[in-house]
Amino acid sequence: MSLPDGPRTPPTLQLIQWIANPLSFMRNCSERYGDSFTVYFGEKMSRAVVFSDPQSLQIILTSDESKQFDAPGELNVVFEPLLGAQSVIGLSGDRHRRMRHLMMPPFHGERMRSYGELIADITDEVMRGCVIGKRFVLRKCMQTITLRVILRAVFGLEEGLRYRQMERALVSLLDASSTRLSVGFLYFPILRQNLGPLSPWGSFVRKREWIDRLIYDEIAERRTQQDTNRNDVLTLLMSAHDEAGEALTNGELRDELMTLLAAGHETTASALTWAL
């Protein structure tokens, strides 16, 4: 299969350009090579074909009956430092299918509709904090809404000490993960040098460990309580079993919670901001 043309610069240089200014890099490629082009993001990564035409994306997402297009988990291995080695987006084959099967029940239509009132209440709570006639940053409000929805609907936390600790810890880690340097950590393992809590990577590791302690404490507490009346995603994941009767381990639960956080926080906040 022939691939669209694209930049001929060394793969590592393409990756650096993308990390430094992704919008500029993609825009320049689109203007030079058209609606589809091929890039190389790093020496060990496969070629990636980028599509910027909405009609092409629609065909890929809705008309791929022959399953020509695939998204193997290996392409997402760069997110392992944040999401963990057992995240569903980093798995392939049978392991991926098993995890998807276990994660599907909490996201059935009726279950999702039951979260509507909670989402509306959180939205009202956050927006009431905005002063009429005074400027505010909309994206910040959307980030707060999505994070609190995740804490309540996914993690199942109620207002209290652990809720506040988790909110602070997640904001701290997500802020640290959104810098260009942190993206460099994901793609260039040689940069992951833990030189103490004040070093960039050391600070990231410390914040991740803080999150992990809070998550594992919450999981341990839930296993002790065994409250089957709760309808948050964590409770439903803990009660799920695969075809062999195996439940998710604590490590798998942690990684999937972090995956849901990463997938539902920044992306949803950005989409809501653009929509408004």
Question: Which functions belong to the PLM regions below?
Answer:
Residues M1-A85, I89-R98, R113, E117-E125, ...:
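N-terminal membrane-proximal hinge/A-helix region immediately C-terminal to the signal-anchor transmembrane segment
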Residues I60-L61, T268-L276:
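Short hydrophobic alpha-helical segments that form membrane-spanning helices or hydrophobic packing faces
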Residues D64-E65, H241, L276:
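Active-site catalytic pocket residues across diverse enzymes, especially alpha/beta-hydrolases
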Residues M1-L3, Q68-F79, R95, R111-S270:
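Cytochrome P450 heme-thiolate monooxygenase catalytic core
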Residues M26, I219, L257, A275-L276:
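Generic hydrophobic alpha-helical segments
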